[in-house]
Amino acid sequence: MRTAIVYYSLSGNTAYVAEKIAERIKTLGEVDIIRIEPKKAYPDKGAKKFFWGGKSAVMGETPALQPYEFNIEKYDRIIFGTPVWASTFVPPLRTFINENPDVKDKKIAVFTCYSGGGADKATDKMKKHLGIEKFEAELILIDPKDKEKEENDAKIEAFCSALI
């Protein structure tokens, strides 16, 4: 089975988890990691980070993305990785989904990273945006780069086991 892990990461938490998941599921088949980035970067520090990221998320914006390589035909499964901004998934992933509407026809899993809550709402909004009822697997982590390594590793392992 060929899997694409498609994610956006501002502070590094989502990137950290994407690498951990890729490491664990590579025994299932080929895994490609696709980091998406908006053409205009979001501020990554201070009040501007929360204001511009939150505004963009709440308004449902779809920012233009940096070029990325993705061919839906190559993949059986898509794993989305997103920080939670204002109780929703990040705008760059909204753009990616809009640009690749056939992803909904693949097996889909999701992982979220957050500091302030709203992860369940974020995954529900992503399901609605994709037009699907459920994910193959879901993983929610609080600040995974900085929190208890063993606890997060166990959650990542359970998520990956659900994909088998």
State each model region's role.
Residues T112-G117:
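Short beta-alpha junction loops
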Residues K121-G131:
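Short, aromatic/basic amphipathic alpha-helical patches
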Residues I72-E73, N98-D105, L130-E133:
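Short, conserved loop/helix-junction motifs that constitute active-site signature segments
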Residues M1-I78, S87-F89, R94, E99, ...:
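N-terminal beta1-alpha1-beta2 submodule of the flavodoxin-like/Rossmannoid cofactor-binding fold
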Residues F89, A119-D120:
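Short, well-ordered alpha-helical microsegments
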Residues K134-I164:
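Glycine-rich phosphate/pyrophosphate-binding loop and the adjoining helix
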Residues T82-P83:
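Glycine-rich, N-terminal phosphate-binding loop of Rossmann-like dinucleotide-binding domains
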